[in-house]
Amino acid sequence: MVNSKILIVEDDFIVAIDLKIHLENMGYNVLDITDNGTDALNKTRETNPDLILMDINLKGDIDGIDTAWKINKLYHIPVIYLTGYNDKNTIKRANVTEPFGYIVKPFEDKDIQLLMGNGSLISYK
């Protein structure tokens, strides 16, 4: 899984940059960062990442769940939600998109490593 290509979709720039730094320090290749669903769809098409880390609350008119649903249907790329939302309705709605994982903010590096470091993503695509 190390050296995997990752797209970060996060509306909080500071969180996104911090996440990028931590992922790169762990050996992952962060392709890009975007803060909205439309850009996420375009960057997914252009860069074909191995994994997308997706916030639910995004800038623009499409949220992370709708974006993940479209990515799943069009590209079959695994998505891990990184979000502050942990209510039942949001989790239920997110689960329809068949996410690879769901991490509630605030999170630690080890939370991401547990999901990404098990090697299952290699056989997912």
Pin down the residues of each PLM region.
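Alpha4 helix (beta4-alpha4-beta5 surface) of REC/receiver domains from two-component response regulators
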Residues: D66, K73, N86-V104, K110, ...
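Two-component/phosphorelay signaling modules centered on CheY-like receiver
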Residues: F13-D32
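Acidic catalytic/metal-coordinating carboxylates
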Residues: N36, I62-D66
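Active-site residues of response regulator receiver
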Residues: D55-I56, T83
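A short, hydrophobic beta-strand element within the central beta-sheet of small alpha/beta folds
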Residues: H76-N86
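Acidic, metal-coordinating helix/loop segments flanking the phosphotransfer/catalytic sites
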Residues: K20, I33-L51
